[in-house]
């Protein structure tokens, strides 16, 4: 019964709450035209956002099909089910568990024309520090990385490793899309940090 509630009832409540929260907030978007250009030309991208900002991200997606990398940990199963409620394909794996098979599945999904979604600092951090997964994915696919973030005027910030944030109703929110980042075969994660793109 507990597993049924966790994997069936909770994702429905969570996805409905996210949609309702989006309607209760005054949400704007900056830089969306950068993503729309790729969508119009049917060119897949890699969408990257920090782990602690993921709550509202399903509402930001502007494409037609996307696969998202989610860890194989217990909470990852819940998140995967929630993401499916928004139409995302969940691919399970992380740098610490199931990473290589997950990377192959992401590359395969990209070759089928899907956008790819990843948290560069997930699933365990350190917070807001890029791990090698997103760079490897960009090098293997040739897709640009498009940074995405969300800011809210009022929010609850938890004391978790990622400083997880949940926006509050009636707050002002803003999705911000960054410029596409094309990764070369020799590029390192420190290069991206020095450029200030994350």
Model-derived regions: residue spans:
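Membrane-anchoring hydrophobic helices of lipid-metabolizing enzymes
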Residues: 1-56, 62-63, 170-172, 194-197
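Catalytic core of membrane glycerolipid acyltransferases/transacylases, capturing the structured
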Residues: 44-97, 141, 157
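A cross-family acyltransferase "interaction/gating" segment
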Residues: 129-189
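Generic beta-sheet signal
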Residues: 93, 119, 147-148
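Short gly/pro/ser/thr-enriched loop/turn and capping motifs at secondary-structure boundaries
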Residues: 75-77, 99, 124-127, 152-156
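Membrane-interfacial amphipathic helices and adjacent loop/beta segments
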Residues: 8-30, 70-111
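Catalytic-site beta-strand/loop segments enriched in glycine and acidic/polar residues
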Residues: 105-137, 141
């Amino acid at each position: 019964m507990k597993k049924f509630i966790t994997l069936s009832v909770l994702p429905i409540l969570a996805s409905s709450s996210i949609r309702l929260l989006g309607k209760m907030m005054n949400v704007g978007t900056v830089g969306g035209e950068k993503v729309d250009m790729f969508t119009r030309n049917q060119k897949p991208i890699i969408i990257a956002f920090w782990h602690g900002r993921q709550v509202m991200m399903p509402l930001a997606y502007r494409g037609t099909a996307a696969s998202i990398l989610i860890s194989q940990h217990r909470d990852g199963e819940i998140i995967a089910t929630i993401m499916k409620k928004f139409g995302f394909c969940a691919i399970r794996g992380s740098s610490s568990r199931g990473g290589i098979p997950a990377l192959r599945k992401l590359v395969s999904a990209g070759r089928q024309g899907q956008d790819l979604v990843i948290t560069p600092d997930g699933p365990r951090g350190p917070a807001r520090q890029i791990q090698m997964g997103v760079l490897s994915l960009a090098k293997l696919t040739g897709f640009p990385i498009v940074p995405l973030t969300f800011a809210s005027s009022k929010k609850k910030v938890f004391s978790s490793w990622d400083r997880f944030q949940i926006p509050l109703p009636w707050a002002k929110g803003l999705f911000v899309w960054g410029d596409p980042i094309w990764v070369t075969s020799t590029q390192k994660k420190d290069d991206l940090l020095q450029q200030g793109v994350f």
